């Protein structure tokens, strides 16, 4: 059963489901379940979601929502994104009490990773 007034499921579109799945499996350890050739769902034990096959992508420039993940070691997460084939779309920058970077995954969806500012 879902919790009231909390995000329960998030759904993305992805042109290359296999590449997107592999990217997030290796980056965050998500577990996936395929539902045919055009849909795969994921869970990380706290939140669930899915990817449907489509040519559209979500970026800030296109007015898409920005999903922001947390990682305690920001530089390590950034390097992992690069190593797994992601592209850095905004390098590490500071904001009040934190730092973050933006990236696109293999299907072009833009996301971000943030961490506390170690100098704050």
Task: Place the predicted regions along the sequence by residue.
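Short linear motifs in intrinsically disordered
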Residues: 28-33, 69-72, 90-93
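N-terminal first-folded block
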Residues: 6-42
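N-terminal beta-strand motif that seeds the catalytic metal site of vicinal oxygen chelate
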Residues: 1-21, 48, 65-67, 115-120
């Amino acid at each position: 059963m879902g919790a009231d007034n909390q995000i329960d499921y998030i759904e993305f579109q992805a042109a290359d489901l296999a590449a997107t799945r592999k990217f997030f499996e290796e980056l965050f350890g998500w577990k996936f379940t395929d539902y045919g050739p055009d849909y795969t769902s994921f869970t990380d034990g706290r939140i669930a979601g899915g990817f449907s096959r489509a040519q559209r992508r979500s970026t800030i420039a296109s007015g898409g929502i920005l999903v922001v993940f947390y990682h305690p070691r920001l530089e390590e997460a950034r390097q992992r994104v690069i190593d797994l084939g992601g592209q850095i779309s905004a390098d590490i920058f500071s904001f009040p009490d934190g730092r973050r970077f933006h990236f696109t995954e293999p299907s072009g969806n833009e996301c971000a990773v943030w961490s506390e500012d170690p100098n704050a």
